[in-house]
Structures are given as C-alpha cells and as structure tokens.
C-alpha cells in the first residue's frame, strides 16, 4: 500500500523485503498454512521465508507427527522454492537470498537443512538441544570444539566484530542515502510527503472526524456491525492508509469500503482486503500491518 500510494518515477521509497525465520514447528502451525496460501495467491514477491529445517521438535524428531514435503506444499501455494543442503554454507544461503530477491511475482521459501545444537558433541541433532540449556559441562565442550577458551563467556572473535561494525557502517550509509532521496522527493511531491509524514507519525488529519454519522436511539436500534460499517466508510476518504477486511464475512460484518477497490496482485493500492476463510492468518496479518508506520488496519469476524 505504501509503495502503491507514494512511490513515484525515480523515487522508489518503499521497496524493502520482509523476512521470516521459520522453524519446523512454525511450518506445522495452521496459521502458517493460511498465511502462506494467501501470500502465494497475492503474489507477494517481497516476502522471503528462511526455513530452519532441522527435523527436531521438543518431543523428538519431527517424524513423530509430521512427514509433509514442505517444498512441494509451498510450490502448490505458488511460492518460489529453493533448498540449501548445509546450514553452515553461508555462500549458498547468500546466493539463495539474492535469487529470492530477484523473484518479483512469488514469495520465496528457502529451506535450509540445519543441525540443531551444532557443535555440541553430545546433544547435536537431538531434542535435548531444543527446549533446555546445554548445561555448563556441555557448553564447555562446545567452546573447546570451536577453539574458544572454555573459561571465557560471551566471546566475540575479532573478525566477527569487524564484520558487524562494517555492516553497521553500511547500514548508516544506506539510511543517509534514503533520507537524501526522500528530501528530493519532498521537493517534487510536497503534498504526498506531508501526508506520509503526518500519518507515519501516528497523527490523523485535523478534519478526519468531521461529518461523522450520528445514530439516534430508537426501539429497533442498529446492529453495532452496521454502525461500524457506516463509520468506516465515513472516515475512509480522510484516512488514505485505512485498510482492512474480513474472513469472508464482509457482507455480514460490514467491513467493505464502498468507494475503494479490492487489494489484489494486480492492484496494491486497493483497500478492501479479502482474507478468505483464514481467521487465524487475518489476525496475524493485521498485526504485521500495524507495525508499518502510517497504516491503520482493521478486521472483523464472528466470535462464537
């Protein structure tokens, strides 16, 4: 929505990717299936999952309760799928991420085969490394295994420290570059910049609550969902980043913004979001939307 509303030729302000690191347990959850199905349908090419595929849960191996072909499952959702055979192969993971970023029409799943408890001589690839601390003696063995002083804690090697400091400097420079671009954008598109700054600050336009409908008490009264729908439509034109919908219940919960189109793979400026019958994903997606400055998400369903 931000990109569709504010990006202009030569000013690609909003083009970031969203990453999720997913465990075997995350992949099993029903909400994961709902969200992944919808993301594939909407062709959200900016979404990248890194799947920590270690085959271990708290109770033991995933084969106790799970034997799905996750890669094929996500392909059926319309995702771009890659596999990295070794979770310690940084170059292979980097290449997979770069490939995923080139994919514009499909979200990406990168299945990375990892070893839980890697470096622990007695607990690697076991459930013991999942839900409990390694313990002092095992931790000492891990340090020795990696060539660290076993008597020291919170060890950060010099080359690691240098690497992160370089990344920090690179990030600072990218931030400066973005703000330089934004200052130029502000000169060329002052109205759009002013609107974005207001909404991203958490403030609302001064006139947002002008001419709101008034509901008088009566014998019959009005269902709260009907009143809510009228209120949403009354403020929608004044709040351009108000976006939401329902889990296939818009006619009943009155969440449709009648003056605006639906959000779709072809129209990211649409403001009516069709979640399908995916209530769990709807809740998670709305929370994710709320993390983006400026966007005001809403949703509705029946509670029984």
Tell me what each language-model feature is.
Residues 1-18, 83, 166-304:
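Thiamine diphosphate
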Residues 1-166:
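Glycine-rich ThDP/TPP pyrophosphate-binding loop and its adjacent helix/strand module
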């Amino acid at each position: 929505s931000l990109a569709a509303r504010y990006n202009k030729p030569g000013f690609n302000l909003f083009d970031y990717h969203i990453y999720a690191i997913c465990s075997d347990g995350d992949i099993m959850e029903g909400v994961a299936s709902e969200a992944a199905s919808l993301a594939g349908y909407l062709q959200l090419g900016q979404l990248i999952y890194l799947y920590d595929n270690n085959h271990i849960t708290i109770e033991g191996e995933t084969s106790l309760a799970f034997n799905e072909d996750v890669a094929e499952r996500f392909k059926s959702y319309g995702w771009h799928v890659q596999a990295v055979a070794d979770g310690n192969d940084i170059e292979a993971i980097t290449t997979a991420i770069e490939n995923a970023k080139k994919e514009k029409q499909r979200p990406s799943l990168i299945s990375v085969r990892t070893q839980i408890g890697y470096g622990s001589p007695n607990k690697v690839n076991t459930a013991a490394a999942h839900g409990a601390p390694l313990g002092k003696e095992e931790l000492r063995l891990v340090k020795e295994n990696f060539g660290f002083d076993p008597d020291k804690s919170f060890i950060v090697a010099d080359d690691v420290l240098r690497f992160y400091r370089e990344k920090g400097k690179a990030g600072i420079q990218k931030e400066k570059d973005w703000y330089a671009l934004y200052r130029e954008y502000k000169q060329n598109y002052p109205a759009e910049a002013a609107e974005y700054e207001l909404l991203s600050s958490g403030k609302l336009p001064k006139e947002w609550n002008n001419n709101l409908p008034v509901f008088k008490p009566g014998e019959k009264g009005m269902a709260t969902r009907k009143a809510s729908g009228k209120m949403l439509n009354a403020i929608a034109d004044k709040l351009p980043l108000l976006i939401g919908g329902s889990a296939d219940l818009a006619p009943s919960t009155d969440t449709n913004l009648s003056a605006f189109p639906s959000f779709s793979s072809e129209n990211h400026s649409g403001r009516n979001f069709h979640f399908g019958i995916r209530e769990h994903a709807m809740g998670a997606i709305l929370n994710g939307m709320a993390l983006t400055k400026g966007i005001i998400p809403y949703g509705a369903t029946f509670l029984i």
